[in-house]
């Protein structure tokens, strides 16, 4: 049975951040889906059950390689639990690593003052690309058309998306897990992945490198998941 690559974007951005890799996988004969998580905060907390339901709704009944980016890493354990034995491998692409078990929040305590300063009186944050200087966004998304597309689909998330406790089921990492490292802010995360005994591949770039070099990212995902 063919394996499906389920490419999970950070809820801070949108599905177009994985679309080029999905297209590359399909050109090579692999099945790929990109769940759209841009609506998961509609209706109030907790948000993670909607993430799980959204992923399950678009995932076929095949073996699955879960590929997560950025803060979607914290959601991987509950997504994996929702998909059950379908998941045969997990790839963290410049993504946060959850603990082995317990609870986790999307934002660390030290980052919350920055987020609180950004939030409006209604507790809603600007779009993620509006958090940063324009030159930094241009560096991450150098193609103007891609930059417009990514910016346009971003949701404005409530502050409590970043503070909600997300459960981390025991044994989520019993399958093959690996780390694809793009950017310098994730060097410590890559080191932690290596300490856990995971394969780590370095693909130098910025945080949205899958939109800039989708073929190279696809190569790395296939190798890390042993599907090349």
Q: How should these model regions be labeled?
A:
Residues 2-41, 62:
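Conserved HGGG/HGGXW glycine-rich cap/lid loop of the alpha/beta-hydrolase fold
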Residues 8-11, 69-70, 95, 182:
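Glycine-rich His-Gly loop
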Residues 34-65, 81-82, 105-113:
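Active-site loop/oxyanion-hole signature of alpha/beta-hydrolase fold enzymes
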Residues 66-67, 90, 179:
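Conserved alpha/beta-hydrolase fold motif
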Residues 67-76:
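Gly/Ala-rich beta-loop-alpha elbow adjacent to hydrolase catalytic centers
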Residues 81, 85-87, 91-124, 161, ...:
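Flexible "cap/lid" loop of the alpha/beta hydrolase fold
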Residues 125-171:
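Conserved alpha/beta-hydrolase catalytic His-Asp/Glu region
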Residues 155-215, 219:
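Conserved serine/cysteine hydrolase catalytic core
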């Amino acid at each position: 049975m063919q394996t499906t690559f389920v490419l999970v974007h950070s809820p801070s951005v949108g599905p177009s951040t994985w679309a080029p890799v999905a297209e590359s996988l399909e050109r090579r004969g692999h099945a790929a889906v990109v769940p759209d998580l841009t609506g998961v905060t509609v209706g109030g907390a907790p948000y993670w059950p909607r993430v799980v339901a959204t992923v399950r709704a678009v995932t076929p009944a095949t073996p699955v390689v879960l590929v997560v980016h950025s803060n979607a890493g914290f959601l991987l354990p509950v997504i994996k639990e929702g998909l059950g034995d379908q998941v045969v491998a997990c790839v963290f692409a410049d993504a946060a690593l959850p603990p082995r078990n317990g609870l986790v929040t999307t934002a660390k305590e030290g980052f919350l003052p920055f987020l609180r300063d950004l939030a409006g009186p209604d507790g809603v944050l600007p779009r993620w690309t509006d958090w940063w200087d324009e030159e930094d966004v241009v560096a991450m998304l150098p193609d103007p058309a891609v930059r417009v597309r990514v910016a346009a689909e971003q949701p404005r998330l409530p502050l409590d998306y970043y503070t909600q406790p997300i459960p981390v089921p025991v044994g989520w990492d019993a399958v093959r897990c690996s780390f694809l490292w793009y950017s310098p802010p994730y060097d410590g995360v890559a080191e932690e992945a290596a300490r856990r005994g995971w394969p780590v591949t370095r693909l130098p770039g910025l945080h949205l490198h899958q939109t800039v070099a989708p073929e190279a990212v696809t190569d790395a995902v296939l190798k890390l998941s042993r599907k090349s």
